[in-house]
Each structure stands twice: as structure tokens, then as C-alpha cells.
């Protein structure tokens, strides 16, 4: 059973009402003035984020596109149009394919401080001569809050010594908004800034800051630091940004010299040059002997002190006996390209060393003279020794001669005590051991009958082979044997008695 259809007469009034309502709405939209609505007067985003700019219209009439611009006037910057070439960073918020779409909001990604400015949503009307600007929205001010760049510190271009004042400069840029604070510190102690400026002074998309402070250097500043701290709203209460400068790149601590001498083995003297508390460690040390360069050494081994400075020690061994006069030793140091500094040590030579020339390193002539002196000395010593030996031997011989020499005494003892008679021919020889007393020999009596010769033969022991000596014979006694005296009527001829002494020589 089919449902009952409405009567044709009843539908006609309903259709008329719908057409009337439709005509009324269309007339309102078409005849009313088009409005371009930008609800946000200002939008603030951080650099690197995405900004959304809203724009809607109240009517699609007149026919024409919607375009976005930054700024006003002839120099305004074209930002976006749906029907134009694509824009990498700008996209449409609404669905562009939707019929009767009246939302023309856009999104700008990866915002930078350069994107800051006033953006306008503008309605154009299509005409024969082209698109003509019809209506513009009030504009939306886009502000970009950008973090400041890390502070950069710069100091003096040349090194300075302690007790000098040097300037340090801190710079940071690219931040927005303009308000920013900057502080200086040295080793945790705040320093006052001598000058600080934020540029530009007028409104701009980003700003930069420049600040200067003065630092008084000290000897212990090798490990010191100068710090610049920057605080900005974009840091959202986090730690401030810091820039650091190490004073080790700025300071130069000149060395102090100490030179001492101490005796070593033999005639050696060890001269020490102590180079203390210098920085940086670029150093060259030279030894001078009486103003003449003796040795140069580039320091390679250092002793680092707690304050960051360095020490170096150099030794110079001197043979004091090689010098007849005082020696001036100079320790000369060139540090970090600066003029050389030096210190002297005078090595005194004692008086005996001044009078002799034995400690000198011998040259060719000195060596010859030394050899000659040695030979002459040895020869003289031998001659003296021989002379002493000769004198000694002569003295011994004289002493022996005095002790062993005695007078040869010939005497004639009594005939009745010891008598030995040998009857021989007229020329017989009698040998006897003689020890004659002093005095004159008795004269033979004239009444002796025989004329004969009597001898005393004395032989001495052979002397030692090594000595040339005279041997004196000690004659104990001589017995002259004669025949008994015969009385004669007349005197007999005289006879002689001899003592024969034989001496053997070498």
C-alpha cells in the first residue's frame, strides 16, 4: 500500500518561501560591503618557530583573489597568494578546495628576526586591466623574539706585562626584543663596564650589544679568566650566555734570573743559572764567557709552577785551573721575542793558579814546551842522583882507608925468642910475617960473616870485584933469620934487608 502523496496545491506555497529566503540571503551578501578581518593586532613568536596570521572575509564578492603583504606602500613585500607561485615557508591554513571558502589565514614556518613586521591581508577585484586592490585588513604586527648570539670576547693584540691595564670587548647580536643585560667578571669578581651600547636605538627586527671593560693584570693571572654574561627574555630564566677570555693569551710574565757557582770535583766549578717564573715558555738561554758566546740552548724541559708560570735551570761546568785571570760568566735569556736579559757571575782565580800555566788546555806549542820541561827535569834528577851516589861512594872509600890504613912497622925482635935459621947459599930468601914497631931499623952489625938478602913477602886477600880499592897489609912481625955471627978479623961487606909488599888491583 503506497503512502499518500501531498497534494500539488500544498507544495507550491513551500517552494515560494524557500526561494524568497534564498534571494534574501544572496542579496545581503552581495549588496553588503565586504569586510577583511584580521583578529590579532599582534603576534609574537620565537625565532625558529612557526607564526600563524589569521584573515577572513565576509563576502566572496567582488570576484578576485586574496593576497598577503608585509608593510605598506610601493615598497611593501609580497608574501603569499594562493593562485601565485608556491612559497616554501608560507602555507594556507584553510582547505583551499572547499567551496565558498572565506578563510585566508596563513602559516609562516622557521621564523627569523627578519620576518618581524606588519602583515596585511588584501582583497583584490578582478577587472579587465587586471587585479585591482579592493579592500585591506587592518594588519597584524608580527614580532620575533630572538635569542642573542653567544658573546664573543676580544682582548689586546699584543701581550702585556703585570701591572698593565688592558681592554676587553664583548659583543652579541641578533636578539629581539631590544632589552638586554650584560655583566663582566674576573675570576668570579664582578667588573665594571667602561662602556656599553645597544644598536640600533630605533625599532628594528634585531639588535646587537657591545661592551668594554678594563682589566689590571697581575703576575698570578696566567690561570685567570675574564667572563662576559648576557641575559635576555628569550632565555626564559635559564642561565645567561657566557663568553670567556683566558688571560694566558694576553699576559707575559718576564723571567727573573739567579746565577750561582759551587765547587765540583777537582778544579771544576759548577755555575748554575736559574730562570724563574716566566710565561709563556718560549725561551732561549745563552752562556757567555768573558763576553764571548760559549753555548746556546733552547729550553725544552720546564718545571711548571702552581700559578702557571715556568722555571728552567741550566748548568755550566768551568775548569778553574784553565784560567789565569778572573772569568766573567753571563747567563743571557731571550723570552717571547723581547730584548734579552742577563746576569753575571765572576769566577775568581786563586794566586797559585795565576802563577802557573798547567791547568790550561794545551795547544800545540804548550804541549811541546811541557814535554821539554819534563825531559829536562828527568835528566836533572838523574844527574843529581848520580852525583849524590858518587859522593857517597867516595866518602865510604875515604872512611875505609882511614880505618884500615896503619903504618907498616918493621922491627927486629930478640934473637932468642923466635929464631928460624935457614942455611942456604949467599942469596937465600927468607919470608916472614912482619909486624914491625915504629922506629928506625937496626943497623946490621959489621961482624956478620955472611952476605945474604932477606925478604918479607906479604900477600893481601883479593878485594871485592865491584870495588877498586887499595889493600894495606898489616905487618905483624918480621923475623930475619941469619946464621950465627962469626967473629971476623975484618969487617964484612954491608947487606940489605927488604920488605916486599905486593898489592893486587882490580
UniProtKB/Swiss-Prot annotation:
PANTHER family: SIGNAL-REGULATORY PROTEIN BETA. PROSITE patterns: IG_LIKE. The gene is SIRPA. This is Tyrosine-protein phosphatase non-receptor type substrate 1. Residues 148-248, 255-348 form the Ig-like C1-type domain. One of its GO terms (biological process) is positive regulation of phagocytosis. A motif (SH3-binding) lies at residues 441-446. Binds PTPN11 when tyrosine-phosphorylated, except in macrophages, where it primarily binds PTPN6. Binds GRB2 in vitro. Binds JAK2 irrespective of its phosphorylation status and forms a stable complex. Binds SCAP1 and/or SCAP2. The resulting complex recruits FYB1. Binds FGR and PTK2B. Interacts with TRIM2. Disulfide bonds join 55-121, 170-228, 273-331. The chain crosses the membrane at residues 372-392. The modification Phosphotyrosine is found at residues 431, 455, 472, 498. Residues 136-159, 344-364, 402-468, 480-506 are annotated as: Disordered. It is a single-pass type I membrane protein. One of its GO terms (molecular function) is SH3 domain binding. The keyword Transmembrane helix applies. It comes from Bos taurus. Phosphorylated on tyrosine residues.
Amino acid at each position: 500500500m503506497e503512502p499518500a502523496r501531498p497534494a500539488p496545491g500544498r507544495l507550491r506555497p513551500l517552494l515560494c518561501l524557500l526561494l524568497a529566503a534564498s534571494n534574501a540571503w544572496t542579496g545581503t551578501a552581495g549588496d553588503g560591503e565586504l569586510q577583511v578581518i584580521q583578529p590579532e593586532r599582534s603576534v609574537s613568536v620565537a625565532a625558529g618557530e612557526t607564526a600563524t596570521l589569521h584573515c577572513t572575509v565576509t563576502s566572496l564578492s567582488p570576484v578576485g583573489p586574496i593576497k598577503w603583504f608585509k608593510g605598506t606602500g610601493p615598497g611593501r613585500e609580497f608574501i603569499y597568494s594562493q593562485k601565485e607561485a608556491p612559497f616554501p615557508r608560507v602555507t594556507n591554513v584553510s582547505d583551499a578546495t572547499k567551496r565558498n571558502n572565506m578563510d585566508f589565514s596563513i602559516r609562516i614556518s622557521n621564523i627569523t628576526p627578519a620576518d618581524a613586521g606588519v602583515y596585511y591581508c588584501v582583497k583584490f577585484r578582478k577587472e579587465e586591466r587586471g587585479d585591482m586592490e579592493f579592500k585591506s585588513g587592518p594588519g597584524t604586527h608580527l614580532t620575533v623574539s630572538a635569542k642573542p648570539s653567544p658573546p664573543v670576547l676580544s682582548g689586546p693584540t699584543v701581550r702585556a706585562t703585570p701591572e698593565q691595564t688592558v681592554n676587553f670587548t664583548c659583543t652579541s647580536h641578533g636578539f629581539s626584543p631590544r632589552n638586554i643585560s650584560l655583566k663582566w667578571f674576573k675570576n668570579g669578581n664582578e667588573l665594571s663596564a667602561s662602556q656599553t651600547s645597544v644598536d640600533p636605538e630605533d625599532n628594528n627586527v634585531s639588535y646587537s650589544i657591545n661592551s668594554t671593560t678594563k682589566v689590571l693584570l697581575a703576575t698570578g693571572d696566567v690561570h685567570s679568566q675574564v667572563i662576559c654574561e648576557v641575559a635576555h627574555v628569550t632565555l626564559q630564566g635559564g642561565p645567561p650566555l657566557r663568553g670567556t677570555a683566558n688571560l694566558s693569551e694576553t699576559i707575559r710574565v718576564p723571567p727573573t734570573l739567579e746565577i750561582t757557582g759551587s765547587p765540583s770535583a777537582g778544579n771544576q766549578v759548577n755555575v748554575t743559572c736559574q730562570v724563574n717564573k716566566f710565561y709563556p715558555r718560549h725561551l732561549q738561554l745563552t752562556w757567555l764567557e768573558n763576553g764571548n758566546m760559549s753555548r746556546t740552548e733552547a729550553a725544552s724541559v720546564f718545571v711548571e709552577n702552581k700559578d702557571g708560570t715556568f722555571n728552567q735551570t741550566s748548568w755550566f761546568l768551568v775548569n778553574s785551573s784553565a784560567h789565569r785571570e778572573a772569568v766573567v760568566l753571563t747567563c743571557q735569556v731571550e723570552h717571547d721575542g723581547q730584548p734579552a736579559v742577563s746576569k753575571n757571575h765572576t769566577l775568581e782565580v786563586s794566586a797559585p793558579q795565576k802563577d802557573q800555566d798547567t791547568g790550561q788546555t794545551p795547544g800545540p806549542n804548550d804541549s811541546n814546551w811541557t814535554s821539554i820541561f819534563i825531559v829536562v827535569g828527568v835528566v836533572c834528577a838523574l844527574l843529581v842522583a848520580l852525583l849524590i851516589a858518587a859522593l857517597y861512594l867516595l866518602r865510604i872509600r875515604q872512611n875505609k882507608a882511614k880505618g884500615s890504613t896503619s903504618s907498616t912497622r918493621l922491627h927486629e925482635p930478640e934473637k932468642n925468642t923466635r929464631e928460624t935459621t935457614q942455611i942456604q947459599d949467599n942469596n937465600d930468601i927468607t919470608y916472614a910475617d912482619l909486624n914491625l914497631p915504629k922506629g928506625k931499623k937496626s943497623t946490621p952489625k959489621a961482624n956478620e960473616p955472611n952476605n945474604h938478602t932477606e925478604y918479607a913477602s906479604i900477600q893481601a886477600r883479593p878485594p871485592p870485584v865491584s870495588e877498586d880499592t887499595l889493600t894495606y897489609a898489616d905487618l905483624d912481625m918480621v923475623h930475619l933469620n941469619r946464621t950465627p955471627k962469626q967473629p971476623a978479623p975484618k969487617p964484612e961487606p954491608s947487606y940489605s934487608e927488604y920488605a916486599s909488599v905486593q898489592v893486587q888491583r882490580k
